[in-house]
Protein backbone atom coordinates (compact mmCIF):
# COMPACT_ATOMS: atom_id res chain seq x y z
CA UNK A 1 0.00 0.00 0.00
CA UNK A 2 1.45 3.43 -0.88
CA UNK A 3 2.49 5.78 1.92
CA UNK A 4 0.03 8.68 2.04
CA UNK A 5 1.43 12.19 2.34
CA UNK A 6 -0.36 12.83 5.65
CA UNK A 7 1.59 10.01 7.29
CA UNK A 8 5.02 11.39 6.38
CA UNK A 9 4.75 14.32 8.81
CA UNK A 10 5.46 14.11 12.54
CA UNK A 11 2.13 14.55 14.29
CA UNK A 12 3.89 14.96 17.66
CA UNK A 13 5.36 18.28 16.48
CA UNK A 14 2.29 19.79 14.80
CA UNK A 15 1.05 23.09 16.12
CA UNK A 16 -2.67 23.77 16.34
CA UNK A 17 -4.71 25.64 15.34
CA UNK A 18 -2.69 25.66 12.13
CA UNK A 19 -2.86 25.65 8.35
CA UNK A 20 -0.62 23.30 6.34
CA UNK A 21 -0.41 22.63 2.63
CA UNK A 22 -0.85 18.87 2.66
CA UNK A 23 -0.53 18.36 -1.08
CA UNK A 24 -0.61 20.08 -4.45
CA UNK A 25 -1.27 18.38 -7.75
CA UNK A 26 -2.03 19.28 -11.36
CA UNK A 27 -5.10 18.06 -13.21
CA UNK A 28 -4.73 16.77 -16.79
CA UNK A 29 -6.04 20.18 -17.93
CA UNK A 30 -3.37 22.06 -15.96
CA UNK A 31 -5.40 23.30 -13.00
CA UNK A 32 -3.69 23.18 -9.62
CA UNK A 33 -5.51 21.43 -6.79
CA UNK A 34 -4.28 22.21 -3.29
CA UNK A 35 -5.22 20.16 -0.25
CA UNK A 36 -4.95 21.94 3.09
CA UNK A 37 -4.69 20.38 6.54
CA UNK A 38 -6.72 22.68 8.79
CA UNK A 39 -5.57 21.40 12.17
CA UNK A 40 -7.96 22.45 14.93
CA UNK A 41 -6.42 20.34 17.73
CA UNK A 42 -2.98 19.03 18.65
CA UNK A 43 -2.82 15.40 17.51
CA UNK A 44 -3.03 12.80 20.27
CA UNK A 45 -3.60 15.52 22.90
CA UNK A 46 -6.96 17.02 21.97
CA UNK A 47 -9.99 15.95 19.97
CA UNK A 48 -13.14 17.70 18.81
CA UNK A 49 -16.40 16.25 20.16
CA UNK A 50 -18.35 14.27 17.55
CA UNK A 51 -21.52 16.39 17.70
CA UNK A 52 -19.54 19.61 17.51
CA UNK A 53 -17.38 18.51 14.59
CA UNK A 54 -20.48 17.28 12.75
CA UNK A 55 -22.26 20.62 13.20
CA UNK A 56 -19.08 22.43 12.23
CA UNK A 57 -18.92 20.32 9.06
CA UNK A 58 -22.34 21.66 8.05
CA UNK A 59 -21.48 25.29 8.86
CA UNK A 60 -17.78 25.48 7.96
CA UNK A 61 -18.15 24.41 4.33
CA UNK A 62 -20.45 27.30 3.47
CA UNK A 63 -18.73 29.93 5.57
CA UNK A 64 -15.28 29.09 4.17
CA UNK A 65 -16.63 29.41 0.63
CA UNK A 66 -18.03 32.84 1.54
CA UNK A 67 -14.60 34.02 2.67
CA UNK A 68 -12.15 32.16 0.40
CA UNK A 69 -13.73 31.54 -3.01
CA UNK A 70 -12.76 34.02 -5.71
CA UNK A 71 -9.49 35.47 -6.99
CA UNK A 72 -8.44 32.16 -8.54
CA UNK A 73 -9.69 29.94 -5.71
CA UNK A 74 -12.68 27.60 -5.63
CA UNK A 75 -13.23 25.16 -2.78
CA UNK A 76 -14.03 21.62 -3.90
CA UNK A 77 -14.64 20.01 -0.51
CA UNK A 78 -14.07 20.40 3.22
CA UNK A 79 -14.21 17.16 5.21
CA UNK A 80 -13.49 16.29 8.83
CA UNK A 81 -10.53 14.05 9.61
CA UNK A 82 -11.39 10.67 11.06
CA UNK A 83 -9.10 11.42 14.03
CA UNK A 84 -11.31 14.45 14.83
CA UNK A 85 -8.35 16.83 15.10
CA UNK A 86 -9.10 18.85 11.97
CA UNK A 87 -10.49 19.12 8.47
CA UNK A 88 -9.05 18.59 5.01
CA UNK A 89 -9.94 21.25 2.46
CA UNK A 90 -9.42 20.57 -1.25
CA UNK A 91 -9.59 23.48 -3.65
CA UNK A 92 -8.71 24.66 -7.11
CA UNK A 93 -5.98 27.28 -6.89
CA UNK A 94 -2.97 28.07 -4.73
CA UNK A 95 -3.92 30.58 -2.04
CA UNK A 96 -1.30 31.69 0.47
CA UNK A 97 -1.57 30.05 3.88
CA UNK A 98 -2.29 33.42 5.52
CA UNK A 99 -5.26 33.97 3.21
CA UNK A 100 -6.60 30.56 4.25
CA UNK A 101 -5.97 31.34 7.94
CA UNK A 102 -7.83 34.65 7.63
CA UNK A 103 -10.79 32.98 5.90
CA UNK A 104 -10.81 30.26 8.58
CA UNK A 105 -10.97 32.84 11.37
CA UNK A 106 -13.74 34.74 9.57
CA UNK A 107 -15.67 31.47 9.17
CA UNK A 108 -15.29 30.75 12.90
CA UNK A 109 -16.64 34.23 13.68
CA UNK A 110 -19.64 33.37 11.49
CA UNK A 111 -20.18 30.13 13.45
CA UNK A 112 -20.41 32.20 16.63
CA UNK A 113 -23.16 34.32 15.05
CA UNK A 114 -25.49 31.35 14.48
CA UNK A 115 -28.25 31.84 17.04
CA UNK A 116 -30.25 28.64 16.86
CA UNK A 117 -29.59 24.98 16.11
CA UNK A 118 -32.48 25.09 13.61
CA UNK A 119 -30.34 27.41 11.46
CA UNK A 120 -27.76 24.68 10.79
CA UNK A 121 -27.89 23.96 7.03
CA UNK A 122 -29.19 20.58 5.86
CA UNK A 123 -30.17 19.53 9.38
CA UNK A 124 -32.82 16.99 8.41
CA UNK A 125 -33.09 13.29 7.70
CA UNK A 126 -33.15 13.82 3.92
CA UNK A 127 -29.86 15.71 3.65
CA UNK A 128 -27.83 14.42 6.60
CA UNK A 129 -26.82 10.86 7.42
CA UNK A 130 -26.98 11.38 11.19
CA UNK A 131 -29.16 14.47 11.53
CA UNK A 132 -29.79 13.96 15.26
CA UNK A 133 -26.04 14.05 16.08
CA UNK A 134 -25.44 17.82 16.24
CA UNK A 135 -24.52 20.42 18.82
CA UNK A 136 -24.37 24.11 17.97
CA UNK A 137 -22.97 24.76 21.44
CA UNK A 138 -20.03 22.38 20.87
CA UNK A 139 -19.40 23.83 17.39
CA UNK A 140 -19.31 27.31 18.88
CA UNK A 141 -16.89 26.17 21.60
CA UNK A 142 -14.59 24.86 18.84
CA UNK A 143 -14.92 28.15 16.93
CA UNK A 144 -14.14 30.16 20.06
CA UNK A 145 -11.05 28.00 20.67
CA UNK A 146 -9.76 28.86 17.18
CA UNK A 147 -10.40 32.58 17.59
CA UNK A 148 -8.90 32.68 21.10
CA UNK A 149 -5.73 30.85 20.03
CA UNK A 150 -5.18 32.21 16.53
CA UNK A 151 -4.01 30.22 13.51
CA UNK A 152 -0.35 29.57 12.67
CA UNK A 153 1.26 27.85 9.68
CA UNK A 154 2.73 24.34 9.86
CA UNK A 155 5.47 23.73 7.27
CA UNK A 156 6.05 20.27 5.82
CA UNK A 157 9.83 20.63 5.80
CA UNK A 158 9.78 21.29 9.55
CA UNK A 159 7.47 18.33 10.24
CA UNK A 160 8.89 15.72 7.86
CA UNK A 161 9.61 12.38 9.47
CA UNK A 162 13.20 11.30 8.71
CA UNK A 163 13.56 8.25 6.44
CA UNK A 164 15.15 6.37 9.34
CA UNK A 165 12.05 6.94 11.48
CA UNK A 166 9.76 5.80 8.67
CA UNK A 167 11.85 2.62 8.34
CA UNK A 168 11.77 2.11 12.10
CA UNK A 169 7.97 2.38 11.95
CA UNK A 170 8.01 -0.25 9.14
CA UNK A 171 6.56 2.11 6.58
Curated annotation (Swiss-Prot):
Q: Does the keyword Iron apply?
A: yes
Enzyme Commission no: 4.4.1.21
| A GO molecular-function descriptor | S-ribosylhomocysteine lyase activity
Q: Which Pfam families match?
A: LuxS (PF02664)
Which annotated residues bind Fe cation?
54, 58, 128
The record's listing under InterPro entries reads: LuxS_sf, Metalloenz_LuxS/M16, S-ribosylhomocysteinase
Q: Which terms are listed as keywords in the entry?
A: Autoinducer synthesis, Iron, Lyase, Metal-binding, Quorum sensing
What this protein needs as a cofactor is:
Fe cation
Per the UniProt entry, what is one GO biological process? quorum sensing
Q: What class of enzyme is it?
A: lyase
Recite the UniProt cofactor note for this protein: Binds 1 Fe cation per subunit.
Q: Which reaction does it catalyse?
A: S-(5-deoxy-D-ribos-5-yl)-L-homocysteine = (S)-4,5-dihydroxypentane-2,3-dione + L-homocysteine
So what family is this one in? Belongs to the LuxS family.
The record's annotation in NCBIfam families points to: PRK02260.1-2
Q: What does this protein do?
A: Involved in the synthesis of autoinducer 2 (AI-2) which is secreted by bacteria and is used to communicate both the cell density and the metabolic potential of the environment. The regulation of gene expression in response to changes in cell density is called quorum sensing. Catalyzes the transformation of S-ribosylhomocysteine (RHC) to homocysteine (HC) and 4,5-dihydroxy-2,3-pentadione (DPD).
On assembly, the entry states: Homodimer.
For this entry, the protein name equals S-ribosylhomocysteine lyase
Q: Which organism is it from?
A: Serratia marcescens
Which gene is transcribed and translated to give this protein?
luxS
Amino acid sequence: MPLLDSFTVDHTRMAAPAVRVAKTMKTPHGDTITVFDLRFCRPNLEVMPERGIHTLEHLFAGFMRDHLNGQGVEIIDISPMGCRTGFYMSLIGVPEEQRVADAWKAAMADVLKVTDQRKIPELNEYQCGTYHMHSLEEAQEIAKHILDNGVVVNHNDELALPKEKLQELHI
